[in-house]
């Protein structure tokens, strides 16, 4: 069993973006390829949770397993994706990553996993005053909490955090760059992110 594993959530339908965000172009590749390059440099095992509509296209781009949600919970948002990844890879801790934060750095995963300890169920960053539960780490004991929520048809990350002993870390306290956490939801944000990248 790995001590740490990674789960990339690439199953959303990207309605506001207009096309699958995982496949958006970024620095000569795609969001999903860039994110996986970063994650696999730090983590031994990584799995991508994808949607049936794009699963084959994602599989052609990446060198890690690509799976869909557990059938019974398909379409139940990030909680379904996280628990599906936890079932696929056995690990003590899981670093979670959405497919729409292409600025993420391998340094972030080093910082994040360095903050884990057995007394906590989760480690969640607070960036510019906002909790980032999808750029966080979760202990494998959280799996049962997720199943319990899904059985009650509860799908909120906030509901999950309310049931966990969470270590919140302020980004500035751990030298985390706020740019790592910028997520792209619309084409306007995508254009801005590309401009910001070219200005660096």
From Swiss-Prot:
Q: Which residues bind Mg(2+)?
A: 100
**Does ATP-binding count among this protein's keywords?**
no
- Name the chain's protein: Probable molybdenum cofactor guanylyltransferase
Cofactor names from the entry are: Mg(2+)
Q: Where is the signal peptide?
A: none
Sorted UniProt keywords: Cytoplasm, GTP-binding, Magnesium, Metal-binding, Molybdenum cofactor biosynthesis, Nucleotide-binding, Transferase
Gene Ontology MF term list: GTP binding; metal ion binding; molybdenum cofactor guanylyltransferase activity
- State the protein's purpose: Transfers a GMP moiety from GTP to Mo-molybdopterin (Mo-MPT) cofactor (Moco or molybdenum cofactor) to form Mo-molybdopterin guanine dinucleotide (Mo-MGD) cofactor.
* Annotated EC: 2.7.7.77
The protein's location, in the record's own words, is: Cytoplasm
What does it catalyze? Mo-molybdopterin + GTP + H(+) = Mo-molybdopterin guanine dinucleotide + diphosphate
| Positions of GTP binding | 9-11, 21, 69, 100
InterPro entries, alphabetically? Answer: MobA-like_NTP_Trfase, Molybde_CF_guanTrfase, Nucleotide-diphossugar_trans
Q: Member of which family? A: Belongs to the MobA family.
Q: What is known of its domains?
A: The N-terminal domain determines nucleotide recognition and specific binding, while the C-terminal domain determines the specific binding to the target protein.
Q: Which CDD domains match?
A: MobA
Protein source organism = Bacillus cereus (strain AH820)
Q: Which GO terms describe its cellular component?
A: cytoplasm
Q: Name one Pfam family in it.
A: NTP_transf_3
Tell me a GO biological process for this protein.
Answer: Mo-molybdopterin cofactor biosynthetic process
């Amino acid at each position: 069993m790995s001590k740490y594993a990674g789960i990339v959530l690439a199953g959303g339908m990207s309605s506001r973006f207009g096309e699958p965000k995982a496949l958006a172009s970024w620095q000569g590749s795609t969001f999903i390829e860039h994110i996986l390059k970063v994650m696999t440099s730090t983590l031994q095992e990584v799995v991508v949770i994808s949607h049936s509509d794009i699963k084959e296209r994602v599989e052609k781009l990446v060198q890690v397993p690509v799976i869909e949600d557990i059938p019974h919970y398909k379409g139940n948002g990030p909680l379904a994706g996280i628990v599906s990844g936890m079932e696929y890879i056995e690990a003590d801790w899981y670093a979670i990553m959405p497919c729409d934060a292409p600025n993420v750095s391998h340094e972030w995963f080093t910082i994040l996993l360095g903050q884990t300890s057995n007394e906590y169920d989760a480690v969640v960053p607070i960036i510019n005053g906002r909790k980032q539960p999808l750029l966080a780490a979760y202990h494998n004991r959280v799996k049962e909490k997720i199943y319990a929520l899904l059985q009650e048809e509860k799908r909120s990350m906030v509901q999950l955090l309310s049931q966990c002993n969470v270590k919140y870390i302020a980004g500035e306290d751990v030298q985390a760059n706020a740019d790592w956490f910028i997520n792209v939801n619309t084409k306007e944000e995508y254009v801005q992110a590309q401009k910001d990248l070219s200005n660096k």
